[in-house]
From Swiss-Prot:
Molecular function via GO: peptidyl-tRNA hydrolase activity; tRNA binding
Class of this enzyme: hydrolase
HAMAP family documented for this protein: Pept_tRNA_hydro_bact
Protein name per its UniProtKB record: Peptidyl-tRNA hydrolase
Subcellular location: Cytoplasm
Oligomer status and interactors: Monomer.
Lineage: Bacteria, Pseudomonadati, Campylobacterota, Epsilonproteobacteria, Campylobacterales
Length: 179
């Protein structure tokens, strides 16, 4: 079974921040699926199951996301992990896909890499870069950024549904957005 993980931070103060685009995409996906909500304490996150995959929003805060991913992956013996995350090295509105590689300094990916290895698939959503990286990723999207955000999330949603039935190379060639 496939595990789709959206990275983000829990708490209302982090809702709609750049670091939470993974959570945002999971929420969009769940709106279009029939899902059962599973235990959240055992897996340190909100876990949902559909006929296509498990969907996880870790509740460990970003730096410990790997604990939640490992708990679900080990318990359900997931043979495929797809992680959705923000990427400051990509311009706002950019959408890219890859397998493995470095964390690029992303603490959520570092945590997953440390506990699960790095051979998982990644859906990278560009949020742009600022001199103060922490304030930038923990900042909310500006009004003028909403159109780009909505566009990339809709494209990523279509890509994810296809990715669950296909491979990342095919999806990348069809759905990547370069900004």
């Amino acid at each position: 079974m496939t595990l789709v993980v959206g990275l983000g931070n829990i708490g209302e103060q982090y809702a709609q921040t750049r670091h939470n685009v993974g959570f945002m995409l999971i929420d969009l996906l769940l709106k279009d699926l029939e899902v059962a909500k599973l235990s959240n304490t055992k897996f340190k996150g909100e876990l949902f199951k559909s006929s296509l995959a498990f969907f996880l929003k870790p509740s460990t805060y970003m730096n410990l996301s790997g604990e939640s991913v490992k708990a679900v992956s080990d318990f359900y013996k997931c043979d495929r992990i797809i992680v959705i995350h923000d990427d400051i090295d990509l311009n706002l509105g950019t959408l890219k896909f890859k397998i493995g590689g470095s964390s690029g300094g992303h603490n959520g990916l570092k945590s997953i890499d440390n506990l699960c290895g790095n051979a998982y698939e990644r859906v990278r959503i560009g949020v742009g870069k600022d001199q103060d990286v922490i304030s930038h990723v923990l900042g909310k999207f500006k009004q003028e950024e909403q159109e780009s955000l909505n566009k990339v999330l809709e494209q990523a949603k279509k890509a994810l549904f296809e990715l669950l039935k296909s491979n990342i190379e095919q999806v990348a060639s069809k759905y990547s957005i370069r900004n």
